[in-house]
Amino acid sequence: MNNIIKMLNDEQMKQDVPEFGAGDTVVVKVRVVEGGKERLQAFEGVVIAKRNRGLHSAFTVRKISNGEGVERAFQTHSPLISSIEVKRRGRVRRAKLYYLRERSGKSARIREKLAK
């Protein structure tokens, strides 16, 4: 029974998900259906949380839009997600960056991780 569930989960998982973590700036392209039309909507922001649970993995992205903080949670292996692109690697010391909710401006900046 357990093997059947694992096999079904592995079948539904996406293989093209890039490696990213908290502090990274990502662009998530989401399929949006409006009326009868389908289009891609880009959501760019900083990953503030990531939850690794196989097929049920999720991550939260935060951005500032018109001076207002906007957060959106995505299921990593959702069929609605067209692509995930990592724009910038961030250097942080925490797994969850919920403290960014209280900060704005320069104090909310994240250092960039330099490749070796």
Swiss-Prot record:
Enumerate the InterPro entries for this protein. Ribosomal_bL19, Ribosomal_bL19_CS, Ribosomal_bL19_sf, Translation_prot_SH3-like_sf
Q: Which Pfam families match?
A: Ribosomal_L19 (PF01245)
* Alphabetical list of Gene3D superfamilies matching this protein: 2.30.30.790
Biological process GO annotation list?
translation
Q: Which GO terms describe its molecular function?
A: structural constituent of ribosome
Matching NCBIfam families: rplS_bact (TIGR01024)
Protein name, as recorded: Large ribosomal subunit protein bL19
Which organism was this protein described from? Shewanella loihica (strain ATCC BAA-1088 / PV-4)
